[in-house]
């Protein structure tokens, strides 16, 4: 399940979604001048592609087995490969510079200005992102296995998009405080996890589905 999760993330988020971005930014280059439109587009695109990949991957996995472990495993693979590609590469570059590898002055200056707090914040953000992916995977798993209506897939798309808003605003410079941005991300991700836990309790704990 983890391998399917990793593969679907790569295929849907890193290939198909990037192709859409290339087409949209080519046809509508002015979208970057409108923060609200740019944020809405980017967050909804991420939610749509990643949750559609989740839906397709879990639909494939659940053909023979419908156990909760499939949803959990998918979330580990999806969130794990994202963390490895996003945070892992940055951590490797930072470690290499700190160990004395040659780097451009701009890189070393940026690392010095960021301080240890930025690295801690990145780690906390990745943990929060992993929890989000686990929760959304369980939500889509419940939809695939008919424990909840299929429209919960669309709820997953919107929840994913909402969780991406703070990071998008931070990238646009509209959230200048790193800790403010991280605090909002943690709060939103925690709210999503609590929502999914509530749905899971009602659908699977209090009214378990046989088979």
Regions found by a protein language model. Give the residues of each.
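Hydrophobic alpha-helical segments at protein termini of multi-pass membrane proteins
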Residues: 1-211
